[in-house]
Amino acid sequence: MKLRKNSAGDFLQTVRVMLALVALTQSFFGPLAQSAHADDDHHGKRTRTPIKHVIVIVGENRTFDHIFATYKPKAGESVNNLLSEGIVNEDGAPGPNYSKAQQYSADITGSTTYELSPTSGKALYPVLPAPLNGGPTNVCTDNGICTLHDAISSENGLALNYYQYMLTGGTGLTGKVPDTRISGVNGSSPYSSLMPGPFQLTNSKGADTFPYDSYAASPVHRFYQMWQQEDCDISHATAENPSGCLADLFTWTEVTVGSNVNGAAQPPNFSTDYAPGKKTTGEGATAMGFYNMLQGDAPYTKQLADRYAMSDNYHQPVMGGTGFDEIFLYFGDAIWFSDENGNALTPPHNQNVWAGGPVDEIEDPNPVAGTNNWWTQDGYGGFCGSITNPCPTGVSNVYGGGSYTDCSDSSHPGVGPILTYLASLNPPIKSNCEQGHYYLFNNYNPGYFGDGSDAFTDTNSNNTPFTIPGTTQRSIGDVLLENNVSWKSYNDQWNAYLTDPYQLNYGAVGPTSDQYCNICNGFHYQKQIMTNDGIRKAHLKDTTDLYADIKKGDLPAVSFVKPSGWVDGHPASSKWNLYEGFVKKIVDAVKANEDLWESTAIFVTTDEGGGYYDSGYVQPLDFFGDGTRIPLIVVSPYAKKGHISHTYADHVSILKFIERNWDLNTISGRSRDNLPNPTTVQGNPYVPTNSPAIGDLFDLFQFKEHDE
């Protein structure tokens, strides 16, 4: 990648671009269209509330406690977080109830069966394993973003004063070494003196070695890993925590198996703690880090929470990572491996595919004999064959890829322990797994390219075999189309992706930059959307179209919005302040159009928790989830100012809000939007008594009276 150098010419060019952007912004926020479309034919059905426009903005990979650990609500409101629980103090140090979040190790070396809640050799960590470095060492050298011109030409989705943060925040560390920016982490043995629980990433005592603007490492966030990290067993259940999930194995799972094993043997020099010459999962205790709002972290997020409404009981809908959670946001359900007509098929299992192999796309989280939790087959898929990365004996080009499970069959690896646990609950929870269906639990590319052509059958050498066939399952898009309710999916850098289907320009700097997230756009998986030229072209758009539609006051009823990889807030590859800048640009634009603002609700969330620790209650809804809590803020003139909802909810609650507001049917007979709204008992608003149940988010609003 060619890097730009600072020079007088670069400076003048940057000034020109900045001036042009300022002029564009003045035009953008100047006199706008005087009215947004009301509840007329443009939006089909009339709405039950003054909300005529829903905008759903989805960032990446942060739990509620990770961001809101020390948040303090306004008088009369309460919040459940690390501070309120006494787990940490206001300064981020361990609090009087720190033991609630302490982490344990286990030793299951004699087991060859997936352990959902291991008890063998379970022991409190004396200190946490050292969290390891993640993210660019130097932003200019590693990301190629060296000047404001580089930033502005590569990404158009930030409020102007946030572009500076695309140039900053490098870790200054090289490789997967102890992250010495964190207080309590050392560059020599002993590498960690961190207590065995949550720790503050940022610090304000002495040298500010980890400012909020820094890149941070990313923990493991896969399906079976998260189930294990939650440590769920009915024997742990209490009235306040009837699921019996202790969330005390986050560290142990990430240092014993991590992610992307892909069927490889455990290295002979493997270690669960960092040491020179040893091989680790590359994470350490990364999952336990959090930010401190009381010391100025996440300032725009705090501002929105203070001014509008949020939930402290909103969850990622499944255990695991981005693709699976995003799929639930659109389908309210998991999708399975099928043929073009929707008939369930078996994924490749220890066999060659067009790209080589053998691959094994069926998940097997059973530990390899003689190891302590090193799994048999689990990963996004491996690639080999270069001089620096030769293939193992008997392998050609690709291998691994365990990400599908037939969760209807208790004999399949990993399935039995979860089914047994779900059946033990009161009431027992149904799996919602259909016989012979292999569900996708982790990230695979969708089955279509942006032009609607088939990505699953494409054999171009730049393509990946770790792609799920297109699905005929129904999504919220079908429901909206059937009811003449307008919608668009706005995806940052979609236009660049259309001319770069294999994303060879991913990470490129400048106008060709293509950091579109294909696994984040649920409609991208769906046959009836992607293969219909009229529907696809009308409804799948770039965020440049979003800004234009806001300016014209011509926003659809429902908008799904996804930032690019530059600014989505994903740990290691992005930063939370960049996601804040992305959200701010949209919020400011909508508020600048008074009529549009008066009829809009903006839901700001993340796709999932990214594997970070969270202390909140997790309600089992089916085999797939729920997972940890994640942030949700509702920005609207109708939002209850400073209110914090405790009603149990997840991504499908957004679908329930849309369906209730526009009086729509549910997606299918098995989709999670059929679940009832929760009922609770006094004194425990977080736990539904009619489980499984999720809310519809209406309690975040006050529609009778509002003012700005």
Sequence positions of predicted segments:
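N-terminal secretory signal peptides that target proteins for export/translocation
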Residues: 1-13
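A subset of signal/propeptide-processing and intrinsically disordered low-complexity segments
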Residues: 4-5, 34-36
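Compositionally biased, low-structure terminal segments
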Residues: 12, 29-30, 69, 251
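Sec-dependent signal peptide hydrophobic core
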Residues: 12-23
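C-terminal segment of classical bacterial N-terminal signal peptides
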Residues: 24-35
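N-terminal pro-sequences and low-complexity stem/linker regions of secreted or lumenal proteins
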Residues: 36-708
